[in-house]
């Protein structure tokens, strides 16, 4: 905390009028997007957010077309319109695209677009990371979807259960494309989540303490935490299955001590939290729209925040909800069943808060299109929640499992809980990004077609499921009596498509994207995103003293637009935004932001090319694309920590802020902490796999006498500890101005870290352990492989840091690069020590026990 930074609103506005000539023009010039071909290098959140939303909507439409093809096939019994192989690809791609390429990216996209303005910031803290995440998602997703046109689309279902997807039963490249493609796209989602979390915690407007944050910001903070913890599990699962397919490591082969159930545990450790990762942001949009429509603040703000946190925690206890029919012990099933019911309580708190807000409205406003979609959301989502409680009852789940009842429940929860609120958000926030609002008349047509079509399409699926129709069948015999219900469902699906088509017509007729001249606050809402804004966001950054500042401070919009609050210009000559305290939102320093550039785009191309070429086993081109990705990332990071050569800046009211920061106050330090959390989640998922395989096949574990001798892990641990000590010594030398000490310590420490990994792998090999022998060996080498991956990353970072030192870009006051490297370094050492203890201690304990 900087001494003297204000904790209470200023008595007078920070800047007097008139403002200097040319100040606003210079600000807009600094933030202007590139023209021509260079436009794709834009990094502004308002442009990247629009691109994100447009791409997510494209994937929604493509997945919808696949659904229409499936419904056409199922409309009548014994239909031969589509063969079973293509049908398998259609339902796999439909689920995969909807879940991985539409749902999560769409809510992240809304956050990228809205949050900076909602928080009173100029932009997110890592604009080039936003650009990289978007282009990686767009390029990878489009190439992945195009696989269906060449017969390479995955066909094992969107959750890809082995052994069906093992090389024995799916030897073609289809499954590999899913495993590598989706694993790579999840990395993009994690990058976006880290950016959003740091932005919410560190770039809020002065005065916007945690209890004054908009509900949408709270929810996106919870969303980011859930992504950081949950998504690594599916990355681990995809990596293990790809290792089994490519190199024969038997994680899921029962004859070698593996277990296909491990995939289900890892997948649903990610999969069920993902339901709430999708639902919570949609609920956040509802919590923003309803107060604006009701003309009063949200009832029970603190209770809603508590419900958000409770839902986030409970969602991680529900993964067995999807595994009731797998033979898991009854006690475990009972806990999962209870948790599945308990999670409905915080969800109910939010629903009742919305109803209470509408009931307490001072006057009823005309029912506009956003409210129609929200009312549709209420109806559909509550029905989905009721069927969710039904399938949480174990005996009923055994009957309904893998039938169309579950298909209906899934769509009532996800379409009702996410798609309808998202369309409400499109109609509500369109004036924020467009010169014109969307049409009320066309919006009503779109709503009623989608609402009626959805219920006609999916409600009968409850009945077909109860009548015994299984999921994923491409045809059925007339004698089962499912024909009429399936025809009704098909009619409903095409009605939904008609509603979406009306929405697209509305977009084409009325959407005129404009960052500088939008339609304005047509809803008379009270939150900051409705401030007058341009390409740089709001003209000046306000002091926030309530949750609805536009309602409680009537002159705020005019004063912000006149430049009377903080940071009305570009005092550093470039892009910048305020960094504030994570809890109290006191101004701490001015963050200089990078502008547009090619490195993030080329890094995304390289990353996408690397993973996609690995899929088709083109190793040399894949390596070249990987080199391109690493080179471009290093290039953009080279200038990411500018020299503290600018004097403190007067941002208004006599408040002078430095233009750089080091240590735990730095925004980049917070991002690295979150990256460490991702690494820890990956490590925990691998430890879970290691221990789970012990519980299922202890017979393949070696006796204590067959393990590597004790001196090996002791030597490895000593190297790890020495490596950490060298990193600490380098940091001490940097603080004292002894750069030569740092330049020697970092490469030597990285070498010791790599040697520790090599020693551990060598010890296991000398003990006779081969990764293809059995599941125990495979899990041991997987843990060593993770440690080696982190050691390589630390080696790159240490050499990069040493290079910055040689180039004169590192010092006691310019040490963010070293601080971040040291943070990951010490975590890697800690993980290595824990891993060594587990690999050498647990088998001995288990053998003796």
Regions picked out by a protein language model, each given a short descriptive name:
Residues 725-761:
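Hydrophobic transmembrane alpha-helical segments that form the core helix bundle
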Residues 603, 819-843:
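Final/C-terminal transmembrane alpha-helix of multipass membrane proteins
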């Amino acid at each position: 905390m900087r001494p003297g930074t204000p904790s209470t609103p200023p008595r007078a506005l920070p800047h007097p009028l008139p403002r200097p000539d040319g100040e606003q023009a210079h600000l807009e010039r600094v933030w202007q997007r590139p023209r021509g071909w260079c436009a794709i290098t834009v990094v502004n959140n308002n442009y990247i957010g629009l691109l994100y939303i447009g791409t997510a909507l494209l994937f929604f439409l493509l997945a919808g077309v696949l659904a229409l093809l499936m419904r056409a096939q199922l409309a009548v019994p014994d239909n031969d319109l589509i063969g079973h192989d293509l049908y398998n690809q259609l339902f796999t791609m439909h689920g995969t695209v909807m879940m991985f390429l539409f749902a999560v990216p769409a809510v992240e996209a809304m956050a990228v677009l809205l949050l900076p303005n909602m928080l009173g910031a100029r932009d997110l803290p890592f604009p080039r990371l936003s650009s990289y995440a978007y282009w990686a998602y767009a390029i990878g997703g489009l190439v992945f979807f195009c696989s269906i046109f060449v017969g390479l689309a995955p066909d094992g279902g969107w959750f890809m259960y082995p052994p069906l997807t093992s090389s024995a039963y799916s030897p073609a490249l289809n499954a590999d494309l899913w495993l590598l493609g989706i694993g790579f796209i999840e990395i993009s989602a994690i990058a976006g989540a880290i950016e959003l979390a740091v932005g919410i915690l560190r770039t809020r407007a002065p005065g916007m303490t945690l209890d004054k944050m908009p509900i949408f910001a709270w929810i996106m903070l919870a969303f980011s935490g859930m992504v950081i913890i949950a998504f690594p599990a599916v990355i681990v699962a995809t990596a293990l299955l790809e290792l089994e397919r490519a190199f024969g490591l038997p994680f899921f082969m029962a004859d070698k001590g593996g277990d296909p159930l491990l995939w289900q545990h890892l997948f649903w450790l990610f999969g069920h939290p993902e339901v709430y990762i999708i639902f919570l942001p949609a609920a956040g949009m509802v919590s923003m729209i309803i107060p604006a429509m009701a003309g009063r603040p949200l009832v029970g703000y603190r209770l809603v925040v508590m419900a958000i946190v409770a839902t986030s925690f409970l969602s991680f206890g529900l993964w067995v909800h999807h595994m009731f029919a797998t033979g898991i012990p009854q006690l475990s099933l009972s806990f999962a069943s209870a948790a599945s019911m308990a999670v409905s309580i915080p969800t109910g708190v939010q629903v009742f808060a919305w109803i209470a807000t509408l009931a307490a409205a001072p006057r009823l406003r005309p029912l506009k299109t956003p409210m129609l979609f929200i009312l549709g959301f209420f109806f559909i989502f509550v029905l989905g929640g009721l069927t969710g409680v039904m399938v949480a009852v174990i005996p009923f789940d055994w009957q309904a499992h893998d039938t169309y009842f579950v298909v209906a429940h899934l769509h009532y929860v996800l379409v009702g809980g996410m798609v309808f609120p998202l369309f409400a958000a499109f109609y509500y926030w369109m004036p924020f990004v467009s010169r014109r609002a969307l049409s009320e008349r066309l919006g009503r047509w779109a709503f009623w077609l989608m609402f009626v079509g959805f219920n006609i399409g999916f409600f009968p699926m409850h009945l077909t499921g109860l009548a015994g129709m299984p999921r994923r069948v491409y045809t059925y015999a007339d004698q089962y009596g499912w024909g009429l219900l399936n025809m009704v469902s098909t009619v409903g699906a095409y009605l939904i498509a008609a509603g979406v088509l009306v929405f697209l017509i509305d977009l084409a007729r009325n959407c005129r994207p404009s960052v500088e001249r939008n339609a304005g606050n047509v809803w008379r809402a009270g939150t900051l995103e409705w401030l007058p804004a341009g390409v740089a966001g709001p003209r000046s950054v306000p002091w926030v003293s309530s949750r609805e500042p536009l309602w409680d401070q009537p002159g705020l919009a005019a004063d912000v637009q006149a430049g009377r609050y903080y940071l009305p210009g570009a005092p550093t000559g470039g892009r910048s935004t305020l960094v504030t305290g994570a809890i109290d939102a006191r101004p701490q320093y001015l963050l200089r932001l990078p502008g547009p550039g090619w490195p993030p785009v080329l890094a995304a191309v390289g990353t996408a090319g690397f993973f996609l070429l690995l899929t088709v086993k083109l190793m040399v081109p894949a390596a070249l694309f990987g080199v391109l990705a690493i080179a471009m990332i290093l290039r953009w990071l080279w200038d990411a920590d500018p020299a503290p050569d600018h004097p403190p800046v007067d941002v208004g009211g006599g408040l002078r802020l430095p233009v750089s920061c080091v240590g735990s106050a730095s925004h980049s330090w917070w991002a690295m902490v979150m990256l460490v959390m991702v690494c820890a989640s990956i490590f925990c998922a691998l430890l879970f796999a290691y221990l789970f395989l012990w519980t299922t096949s202890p017979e393949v574990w070696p006796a204590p006498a067959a393990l590597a001798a004790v001196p090996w892990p002791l030597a490895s641990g000593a190297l790890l500890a020495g490596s950490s000590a060298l990193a600490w010594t380098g940091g001490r030398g940097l603080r004292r101005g002894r750069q030569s000490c740092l330049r020697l310590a970092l490469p030597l420490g990285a070498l010791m870290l790599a040697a520790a990994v090599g020693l551990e792998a060598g010890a296991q090999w000398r003990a006779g352990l081969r990764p293809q022998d059995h599941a125990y060996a495979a899990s041991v080498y997987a843990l060593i492989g993770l440690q080696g991956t982190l050691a390589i990353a630390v080696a790159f970072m240490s050499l990069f840091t040493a290079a910055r030192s040689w180039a004169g870009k590192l010092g006691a006051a310019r040490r963010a690069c070293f601080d971040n490297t040291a943070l990951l370094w010490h975590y890697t050492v800690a993980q290595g020590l824990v891993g060594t203890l587990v690999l050498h201690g647990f088998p001995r304990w288990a053998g003796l026990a």
